[in-house]
Amino acid sequence: RLNNHHVLLITTTVVMLYTAASNALNDALDYEIDLINRPERPIPLGYVSIKGALFISFLLFAFGVALCLQLPDMAIVIGVFISLPLMVTYSTNLKGKYLIGNMVVSFLLGASFLFVGVSHEMTSPMLIPMLLAFGLTFLREIIKDVADIEGDLSLGLKTYPIISGVDSYRRIII
C-alpha cells in the first residue's frame, strides 16, 4: 500500500500528464481553428507537427495510465475509464457541440478533485472544490467560446455564442 505522500505525488502527476496529453491532442485536432484563433501556437507556426503532437499526446496518456494503475480501484475507474475516454471524446467529437463540450471540460476539471479524494479515501472534503471547479470552469469555457467565435464559425462549430448569440452569453455571465 502506498503512503499518502506517494499517492499525492501519483495523483498530481496523473492529472498533469492527462492535462498535457489532452492539450496536445486538442492542439493537433484544432490545427485549422488555431490558424485563425491562435496563429501563434506551436503547430500553426510549424514548430511542432500534427503527428508529433499526437505522438506526445499518446505517450503522456500512456504514462498517466501506468501511474494511475498503482492507485485504489475507484481512482482507476475515474482516471482510466471515465476521464481518459472523456478527454479523447471531447477533442475528437464534443468540442464544438452546443454546451456539451463546455460541460465535459468543466466535469473533467471538477473530477480531478474527486480523483484525488478517492485516491486518498476521503471524498467528502473534495465535493465543494469539485463543484466550484465545475462552475467556474463552465463560465470560463463560455468566455473562451466568445473569444474563439471567428475560427469556430469558419469551421461550422455549434458553440453557445454561435447558436444563442453573444447577447445571450452576456446575460449568463453577468
Predicted segments, located by residue:
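Membrane-embedded alpha-helical segments that form the functional core of polytopic membrane enzymes
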Residues: 2-29, 61-65, 76-88, 123-143
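Non-catalytic, surface-exposed connector residues within folded enzymatic/regulatory domains
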Residues: 3, 36-37, 79, 97, ...
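Detector for Asparagine
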Residues: 3-4, 23-26, 37, 93, ...
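Solvent-exposed interhelical
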Residues: 14-63, 135-174
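A cytosolic-side transmembrane-helix exit/cap motif
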Residues: 27-34, 97-105, 122-129, 146-153
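Intramembrane alpha-helical segments
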Residues: 43-128
